[in-house]
Amino acid sequence: KPVFCEKPLATTKADCAEIVRIEQAAGRNLVQVGFMRRYDPDYRKIKAILDSGELGKPLMAHCISRTPRIAAGFTNAMQVTNVLIHEIDQFRWLFGEELVRGQMLAARNTAFAADGLNDPQLALMWTESNILIDVECSVNSYYGYEIGMEIVCEKGTIRLPLPAEPIVRSRLKVGNEIIDNWAERFPKAYDNELQHWINHLRGIEPTAGPGSKDGFAACCIADAMIASQTSGTVEAVNFDM
């Protein structure tokens, strides 16, 4: 039976591998994983620019992932499995190559971080061709929800635009509101991914969305990043099943 699974595919590499094996035995795509940024219109435009080659090869990427608050019980590992997992998948998709090593670094803690939680954290990841990716991850940013990305290429850069909000000028001030959460930032992405999944099941859309192998790869990369939270060093990704 076809299944749409919210990310992550599973919480352990072994469970992800078992899902991949079951799907392979069935001989067809059964699982789509909810990596919805692949369906966001802005990300798709960036993907098209990269694929065109007009800016040359990508060299580096700088990202921010800021959430104003998080529920009790949030752990350091969840910074990777619940937050960074999106950047892990989006760059596998955008660059068309694997992330092969990474490191997590802790900064000075915000006063809003719960006991035992390092926040913010900085993720460094390298692809097979040595594209360097840095991601600032914060789940206690206080001021609002913000996702940012700039990709540095040989002939120029590509920056993810901020959500369009009315700019108000009044009483000696000018400014705009900042959104509060992911649901306000990615409504089209969620609609598009579910419609794509339905269309694929009905035979209207020939190309499958992110599947069990993508979920497995993301889990392998996440494991390396979580290991780095403890070791403090660069960790290689192990893709062995």
Task: Please provide the spans of the model-predicted regions.
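NAD(P)-dinucleotide binding in Rossmann-like oxidoreductases
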Residues: 113-116, 128-195
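C-terminal helix-rich "cap/oligomerization" subdomain common to oxidoreductases
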Residues: 17, 24, 199-241
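A general structural signal for well-ordered alpha-helical segments in protein cores
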Residues: 16, 43, 87-91, 191-197, ...
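Short glycine/serine/threonine-enriched helix-capping/active-site loop
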Residues: 32-35, 61-64, 104, 237
